[in-house]
Every structure is written in C-alpha cells, then in structure tokens.
C-alpha cells in the first residue's frame, strides 16, 4: 500500500505541484472511497478499466520512444548479458534476491488471492492468471526498454527523481504524458485498493473471526471490514510519507513475505503433515532473522538502507541480496524440521475440515442469490 502511494505522491508533486504528503492523503482518500463503497466488485471492475488504460499507455509510450530515439540498451544491460545473474560484481545476488522475493514472495499476497478466490470457477481463475502473467511481462518489458533508452540517450538518472517522470515531464508530448500518467495512477490505485480490501477482510474475518449474521439490519462482517480499512490506510500513509521510495517499500513487503510465509504456504498446499507449530515457528524465525539482517545491512537492494540500520562493522554491502535468500532458507529449514517434530494434530485437522465445510455452505448460500453462477457452487472450496 505504502509503495503505491509513494508513486502517486511523487506524481502529484511533480505534475500538479501538490505537496508530497498532501498528494498521498488525496490518493489514499480516493482509493478508500470506492473500496469502501463497492468492495471486491468495485475493485474488480475498476481493475479491468485500469488495466486497459495501462496497456494502451504502455504501447503508446513504446511506439513514441522507438520512433523518436530508437530502442537503445546500454552496454551490459541487455537481455543476454547474463553477468547480471552470474557475477557478484555485476549485482547477481541482488538481482536473484529481487527475482525470488517478487516472484515467490508475492505468491502469499492476499490481494492477489482474493481475485483468485472470487473467480467464477477454477478454470476462469487459471485463465486469468496466465493472461495476467503475459500482460505483466509485456508491460514490464516495455517500461524497462523505455527507461534504458532514456538513460542511454538522454542521460536521465534516478538522482533527479523517477526516470519515467522526468521523461514524461520534459520530452513526451502532453497528450501521451497524460495517458501514461493515467496508467501509472490506475496501476497504483488498483494495487492499493486490493491491499486495503484484502488486509481488512483477513483481519476481521480470519483473525477476529467475525461472520455475517443472516437477517441482521447491518451485517457485522461488512461494518467491521469497512471500519478496519481506516487504521490500515493511516499506517500505510504514514509509511509512505516517512519512506518515500516505491521500489524499496514494495520489495521489502515481498521480502518479508518470502522470509515468513512463502515456504510454508507453498509446501502446505502439497504436504499435509505440517501444523500450526511449524507454520508459526517458521514465520517467527523468518521474521526475526530478516529484521536482524535488515538492521545490519548498510544497503538494501542496492540503495542506502534508511529504513532500519544499526551502524556496524560485521556486515558490508557484499551481504546485500544474500540476506534475502538466507532468511528464506532458514525459515524453510525451520518449517521442515518443525513439521517432522510437531506434525499437525487430529484436533487441528478436524477444525480445518469444519472451516472448509462452513465455507462451502456459506458459498452455496451466496451463490443461491445469483442463479447464473449456481452451476459452479462449491467449485472454489476443496478439502485441500
């Protein structure tokens, strides 16, 4: 949430001359308004519109860049320059840590899961995931090519702010700039909305176990989910104002999920032996190890660590990247060890089956009000 708010804050500051902090408040207020009003429905429909804007803007920017400057890739930065993945001198540990954190750590993201769980059927969810993967790869490649070209031809650097914003402000035609900026805002709003909605829903439903009450004048689950959004946006806004680095905040979020939850989540899909003890121990150890490493690191993913750093002589910049991979390995090892020492108990399994059955009944009740979806009732809930 904070990482996406930073992008909006910088955008409003540079192009609308709105102070950074006020820009964040305005952005989060707009996202919160439509998220509270429509929940997953508004999140899904606005997401579809926002995706269309982003795709059109990306293609337009790529075409303009190619026609104006050509596509220029600096030496050593091309797709076949594998030194970036094999040589520590070229940042291989950091690059691998980024790929693993974003590629595996993001699997645990609940704003992603809510879209999967909300799909009409498993088949629809599968097709949507593959389609989204292709579009994400294409859009990411486009912006990478544009950024590399801008750096090589125009000499733009991140020292003067986001390279994309400099390019849009000084070089790109106004109409195209507006379209691309709309795409940036759309992408940020879509992710921020999903983060707000998913986090509040999990806190209320899974942590505090609030449930819908049939026949109630005001559904307590809906009321408390909306109420939980307020503190979430306050904390996210505070972090965005204090740590104004989009890439660092986004990567840190996935980095922590990788260290705490990714291993147990993926293994738990296929391996029924682990129980609560294994999950909680692995998550606790992973979090502790990653925070300690973060405090010792002078740099974090290649930039100065201004999040949490304790000056020391034990750890140098060479440890950057390795910290992410090592924390994940330690957490996963603890999870496997605890799974063998303290397997899932019969009581835990019985409780989980009861939860699955309750979810199945709740889903059937909800789908009964939507006849066109009735054939897929129960499709998204299985014993696994």
Predicted regions and their residues:
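Membrane-embedded helix-loop-helix hairpins and adjacent transmembrane boundary segments
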Residues: 1-384
């Amino acid at each position: 949430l904070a990482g996406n708010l930073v992008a909006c804050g910088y955008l409003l500051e540079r192009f609308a001359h709105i102070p950074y902090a006020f820009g964040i408040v305005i952005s989060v207020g707009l996202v919160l308004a439509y998220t509270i009003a429509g929940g997953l429905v508004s999140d899904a429909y606005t997401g579809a519109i926002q995706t269309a804007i982003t795709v059109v803007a990306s293609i337009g920017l790529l075409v303009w860049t190619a026609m104006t400057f050509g596509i220029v890739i600096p030496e050593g930065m091309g797709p076949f320059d594998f030194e970036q993945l094999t040589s520590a001198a070229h940042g291989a540990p950091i690059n691998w840590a980024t790929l693993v954190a974003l590629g595996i750590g993001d699997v645990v993201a609940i704003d992603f899961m809510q879209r999967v769980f909300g799909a009409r059927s498993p088949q629809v969810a599968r097709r949507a995931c593959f389609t989204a993967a292709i579009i994400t790869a294409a859009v990411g490649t486009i912006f990478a090519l544009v950024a590399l070209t801008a750096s090589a031809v125009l000499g733009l650097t991140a020292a003067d702010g986001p390279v994309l914003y400099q390019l849009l402000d000084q070089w790109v035609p106004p109409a195209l700039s507006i379209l691309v900026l709309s795409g940036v805002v759309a992408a940020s709003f879509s992710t921020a909305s999903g983060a707000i909605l998913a986090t509040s829903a999990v806190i209320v439903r899974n942590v505090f176990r609030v449930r819908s009450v049939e026949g109630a004048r005001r559904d307590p689950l809906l009321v408390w989910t909306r109420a939980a959004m307020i503190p979430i946006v306050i904390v996210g806004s505070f972090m965005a104002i204090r740590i104004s680095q989009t890439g660092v905040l986004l990567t840190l979020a996935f980095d922590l999920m990788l260290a705490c939850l990714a291993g147990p989540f993926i293994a738990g899909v296929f391996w029924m032996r682990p129980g609560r003890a294994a999950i909680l121990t692995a998550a606790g150890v992973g979090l502790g190890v990653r925070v300690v490493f973060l405090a010792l690191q002078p740099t974090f993913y290649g930039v100065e660590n201004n999040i949490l750093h304790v000056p020391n002589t034990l750890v140098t910049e060479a440890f950057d990247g390795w910290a992410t991979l090592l924390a994940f390995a330690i957490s996963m090892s603890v999870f496997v060890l605890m799974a063998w020492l303290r397997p899932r108990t019969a009581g835990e399994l019985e409780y989980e089956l009861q939860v699955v059955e309750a979810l199945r009944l709740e889903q059937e009740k909800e789908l009964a009000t939507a006849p066109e979806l009735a054939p897929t009732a129960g499709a998204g809930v299985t014993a696994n």
